[in-house]
């Protein structure tokens, strides 16, 4: 398999693990080694999902602030569900009660299914919710769920890319996320 640059990998992520591997493996699913490679990747990721992983600066404090203000918070990701739950327990235990990742019985983002599942578990409606994300997939997911979306600028996509994909609200800092949520709520 070819080595991939960081920029290539950054462009591959966001649409789920299988599509990540389809993009990364030459000839995608047509490659006779694809399924074996995909299985190896999932096993490796399961053992190493926490390697070089940590919350972005200020995110834990943002979540704690939002919870103190009475907001409910959930994580919805296209990462493998067991990894999402493991990372949530490691970094956000006690402050994020719902964390949902990619699993076979529910469509992944940009379909709104995981968002609706999170809202159901939180006892909230889409009218009470704001989606916060860092990608075009997040913008599309929020649109499909009928929710406003705040696009953060510290993730894998820049402001120009997000604007090209329909972003309406931007946050450069976690403080701006909190301010925008209050503004959208008005």
Task: Describe the predicted segments one by one.
Residues 1-61, 68-69, 94:
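N-terminal helical cap/lid subdomain that shapes the substrate entry/recognition surface
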Residues 12-14, 72, 131, 153:
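Short glycine/serine/threonine-biased micro-segments
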Residues 14, 80-81:
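Short "lid" loop at the C-terminus of a central beta-strand within the Rossmann-like core
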Residues 15-17, 59, 75, 102, ...:
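Gly/Ser/Thr-rich helix-start
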Residues 43-75, 81, 85-89, 112, ...:
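Short, acidic loop-to-helix structural element flanking the phosphoryl-transfer center
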Residues 6-7, 32, 67, 81, ...:
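Asp-based, Mg2+/Mn2+-dependent phosphohydrolase catalytic module
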């Amino acid at each position: 398999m070819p080595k991939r640059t960081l920029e290539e990998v950054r462009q591959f992520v966001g649409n789920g693990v299988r599509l990540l591997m389809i993009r990364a493996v030459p000839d995608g699913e047509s490659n006779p080694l694809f399924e074996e490679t995909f299985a190896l990747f999932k096993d490796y990721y399961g053992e190493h999902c926490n390697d070089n992983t940590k919350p972005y600066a200020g995110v834990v404090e943002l979540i704690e602030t939002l919870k103190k203000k009475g907001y409910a918070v959930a994580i919805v990701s296209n990462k493998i569900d067991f990894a999402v739950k493991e990372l949530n327990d490691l970094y956000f235990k006690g402050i994020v009660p719902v964390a949902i990742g990619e699993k076979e019985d529910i469509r992944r983002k940009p379909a709104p299914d995981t968002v609706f599942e999170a809202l159901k578990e939180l006892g909230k409606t889409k009218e009470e919710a704001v989606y916060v994300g860092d990608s075009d997939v997040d913008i599309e997911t929020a649109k499909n769920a009928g929710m406003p979306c705040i696009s953060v600028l510290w993730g894998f996509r820049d402001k120009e890319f997000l604007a090209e994909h329909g972003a309406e609200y931007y946050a450069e800092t976690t403080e701006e996320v909190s301010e925008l949520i209050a503004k959208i709520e008005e």
